[in-house]
Structures are given as C-alpha cells and as structure tokens.
C-alpha cells in the first residue's frame, strides 16, 4: 500500500497553507495498492516531536477501501476520531519551536471498527490490534518562520 501527496515529498517540508501559519487545510493525499481483502482504512496524522508527547492532528477510521484520493481541504468519508485539541477533523502543524515531523499513517484493516465518532487514537489503536493487513506512511516536516 502507498500513501503520497502532490503537495510535498516524503521527508520534505510541508507548505504553510497546510499549517496554522496558512489556511490550515488538510493536504491532498493519494492512496494506492490497497489490499483487495481490506474492509476499511484508517488515517492518523501525528507529531512525535511535540514537547508534551505525541500530538494527534488527525484521526479518521472506517474509511471506505474505494477511497483513492482525499482532496485538499476535505475530510475523507468515514468516522472522525478526536485529535489532541479535543476536536474531530484536521488540525495542521503549529510547532512551538524547531522543526517537527508529521507522520501521516494509513492502515488497511480486515474489518470495519465498531467505535463511535470522537474515539481517541489510543482507543482506535487498541481496536486495530491484530486487524492490520497493510500500512503506509508519509512524513512531512514543518518549522514556523518567526
């Protein structure tokens, strides 16, 4: 399975339009090579470099396996989980200092998950255990210019 974006290269700098310094839009994501036996997809974006521990920016699960693209500034079909701000939906990079890494992690599962909207990443990851068929990752970096 592959996860790419026309907005930035893997390990490359994310443009400011996808951050708190710009329009705070989610980037366009392209999904390919989904296993044919997958029943749902999960997308998690997090920042392991946050001073308070890993910060969850975007959590979505039960995304249909027919999803090949998530358009810029949109939420994929599926169930929205809760990010570290306590909200659902995308929250862009806004690092307090230095360069941070932002991991977009895509998982193909062998089932749909019976979890409610607003589920935390921790609870989602617990429910995903033993259900992951494939995974892909895209990493972007960002540093605020102050």
Feature roles, as predicted:
Residues 1-146:
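N-terminus-centered regions that define maturation/targeting leaders and the start
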């Amino acid at each position: 399975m592959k996860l790419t974006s026309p907005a930035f290269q893997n390990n490359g700098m994310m443009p400011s339009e996808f951050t708190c310094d710009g329009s705070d839009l989610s980037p366009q994501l392209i999904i390919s090579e989904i296993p044919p036996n997958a029943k749902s997809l999960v997308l998690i974006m997090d920042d392991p470099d946050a001073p308070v521990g890993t910060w969850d920016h975007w959590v979505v699960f039960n995304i249909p396996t027919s999803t090949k693209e998530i358009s810029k500034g949109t939420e994929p079909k599926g169930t929205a989980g809760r990010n570290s701000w306590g909200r659902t939906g995308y929250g862009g990079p806004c690092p307090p200092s230095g360069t941070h890494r932002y991991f977009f992690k895509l998982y193909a599962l062998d089932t749909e998950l019976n979890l409610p909207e607003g589920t935390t990443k921790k609870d989602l990851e617990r429910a995903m255990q033993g259900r992951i068929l494939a995974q892909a990752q895209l990493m972007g970096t960002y540093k605020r210019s102050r």
